[in-house]
């Protein structure tokens, strides 16, 4: 992921000025990496090592989404809507 792209994602989803680790930021960064890896796997179908990494990232994102849903349902709904995940 390009550093400038990462910075724009952090700026978009941060909850306060120095925020880099909130669940929203982590979910947004993981979503970007997942989308990038999906494009890679479309052209490299036999790259099973990357596919395993993709599955780990999807699992981590799912855990963060579940955490956010348990803690603050409004923030969960907001991040789902912004990223276009689920429904």
Swiss-Prot record:
InterPro entries (alphabetical): Ribosomal_uS15, Ribosomal_uS15_bac-type, uS15_NS1_RNA-bd_sf
UniProt GO MF annotations: rRNA binding; structural constituent of ribosome
SMART domains, sorted: Ribosomal_S15
GO cellular component, one term: cytosolic small ribosomal subunit
Keywords: Ribonucleoprotein, Ribosomal protein, RNA-binding, rRNA-binding
GO biological process, one term: translation
Superkingdom in the source lineage: Bacteria
Quaternary assembly: Part of the 30S ribosomal subunit. Forms a bridge to the 50S subunit in the 70S ribosome, contacting the 23S rRNA.
Function: One of the primary rRNA binding proteins, it binds directly to 16S rRNA where it helps nucleate assembly of the platform of the 30S subunit by binding and bridging several RNA helices of the 16S rRNA. Forms an intersubunit bridge (bridge B4) with the 23S rRNA of the 50S subunit in the ribosome.
NCBIfam families: S15_bact (TIGR00952)
Family designation: Belongs to the universal ribosomal protein uS15 family.
Name of the featured protein: Small ribosomal subunit protein uS15
Organism, scientific name: Alkaliphilus oremlandii (strain OhILAs)
């Amino acid at each position: 992921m390009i550093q400038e792209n990462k910075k724009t994602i952090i700026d978009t989803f941060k909850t306060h000025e120095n925020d880099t680790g909130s669940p929203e930021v982590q979910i947004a960064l993981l979503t970007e990496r997942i989308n990038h890896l999906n494009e890679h796997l479309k052209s490299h179908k036999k790259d099973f090592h990357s596919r395993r990494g993709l599955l780990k990232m999807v699992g981590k994102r799912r855990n963060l989404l579940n955490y956010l849903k348990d803690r603050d349902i409004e923030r969960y709904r907001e991040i789902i809507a912004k990223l276009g995940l689920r429904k």
